[in-house]
């Protein structure tokens, strides 16, 4: 069995809405291992993105716990939580969130500079990752000069440049046409295999989700394996 990266134990989430107690997630159990790809599908509002935020330590469960590399995220102070998250997790969203005033190379360097790498080390690692996503020749271009697919590739390069244990992606192909969506997903799966990174992708697209080794369905705040899925 490959290395266990993330583990959910009885995770629930509820919010107060006026005088109402709104439950979003119900007693979820989930394990994410290195090199494993997991797709999470479900209708809008089913709790997919909430779960991803909790897995990433961006939100905390109301019940249960999440372990990242064996550490219970609820017990950590903000500094330790941020350090653990930055070291072991990468994030990709539907919108690329590239900084428009910087080049593709500078955007990909950013997590390494935040992590106190020298500019020389950061530039070398960022260029190597841009080459892996097929953007080395576009490294000096700003976000506005890149196509939609190129911007998302740059965002994925930025998420992977720190070599995280797991990449969490929320609708990463949602703003792309079908051809670009397939290309971006192909690249993510190739890099997952090459780098040994765990991959968790939230998507509404059943066809794309079918490419993952494991597909889970979120319905009414509960998570179940998809019938007929590969794993």
Swiss-Prot record:
Q: Where in the cell is it found?
A: Cell inner membrane
> For this protein, what is the EC number?
7.6.2.-
The way it spans or sits in the membrane comes to: Peripheral membrane protein
The UniProt record lists the keyword Cell inner membrane:
yes
Residues at which ATP binds: 42-49
Tell me the keywords, alphabetical order: ATP-binding, Cell inner membrane, Cell membrane, Membrane, Nucleotide-binding, Translocase, Transport
Q: Where is the ABC transporter domain?
A: 6-231
Q: What is its main location?
A: membrane
Per the database entry, which stretches of residues form a coiled coil?
Answer: none
What does the entry give for GO biological process? lipoprotein localization to membrane
Its GO CC terms are:
plasma membrane
Listed GO MF terms: ATP binding; ATP hydrolysis activity
Q: Which domain of life is it from?
A: Bacteria
Q: Please report which protein family the annotation says this sequence is part of.
A: Belongs to the ABC transporter superfamily. Lipoprotein translocase (TC 3.A.1.125) family.
The job of this chain, per UniProt, is described as: Part of the ABC transporter complex LolCDE involved in the translocation of mature outer membrane-directed lipoproteins, from the inner membrane to the periplasmic chaperone, LolA. Responsible for the formation of the LolA-lipoprotein complex in an ATP-dependent manner.
Subunit note:
The complex is composed of two ATP-binding proteins (LolD) and two transmembrane proteins (LolC and LolE).
This chain belongs to which protein, by name? Lipoprotein-releasing system ATP-binding protein LolD
In the UniProt record, the gene name given for this protein reads lolD
